[in-house]
Amino acid sequence: MDYSVSFENVQNSLNSLSSQMKELEQRREALIKETREVISLCSKAIILLHGDKVKDAEALLNSASSSIKKLKDYVICDLDRYLWPAEQEYVEACVLKEIVERKSFLSGHDELNVSLNAYVTGLLDCTGEIKRMIYDNLRKNNHGYSLSLFEIMQSIYNLVYPFSFYDNLIPGIRKKLDVSKRMMEDVRITMTEEYQRTMFLNEFTSISERR
């Protein structure tokens, strides 16, 4: 007995899949293109913050925030991972701004309206900018403030460290923690040397004055 099969339902399903894939690809390309602009805005804001140009940096971060909100409309299925790099850079810049402004509290992911994954990795990236602030302040002999910044850097690392076990769920977190740890060691060595140098100079000055 002859046997034939209708592939109408199969074809309909594949047509739906094709339409879905085309839409996903269009959204993915839009996300990749637009997130580059957000990352650029945040990078420029970070440079301005290190130059104490907080208002100018704030304007760029406001633009970045607006762009991120619009980009969330492109996110369907698992495309949110293409938004993470932009959110991560945004978190890094915003937290740095709050530290530069000496705010009493640092924003959480809800306040910044970003994903938790991007928030935690952005925090770790910010430790690199804090390191730069520490070195800048050491050169200005702002030792007390440098120590405060180091404590902030260390606190961020200690708070995030327990999540190193979720490296398979938060891509790159373990590597970022390793980088952050090395930076803290570098800063600790530099600050110890600077402290010893200062103590020596103070002692030398004291001896010279007694003569």
Model-derived segments and their meaning:
Residues S13, E34-E37, L41, L60-S63, ...:
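Amphipathic, well-ordered alpha-helical segments in soluble domains
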Residues H143-R211:
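Long amphipathic all-alpha helical oligomerization modules
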Residues D2-V75:
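Leu/Val/Ala/Ile-rich N-terminal alpha-helices, chiefly Sec-type signal peptides and the beginnings
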Residues S6, E23-E34, L49, K53-D56, ...:
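Non-transmembrane, amphipathic alpha-helical segments
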Residues T35, C42, L83-E101, N117-L124, ...:
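Extended alpha-helical coiled-coil scaffold domains characteristic of the BAR superfamily
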Residues N15, I46-K70, L138-D167, P171:
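Extended intrinsically disordered, low-complexity coil regions enriched in Ser, Thr, Gly, Ala
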Residues E58-N113:
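Long, charged all-alpha helical bundle/coiled-coil segments in cytosolic proteins
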Residues E98-E101, F105-Y157:
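Long, charge-patterned amphipathic alpha-helical coiled-coil/hairpin "stalk" segments used as oligomerization
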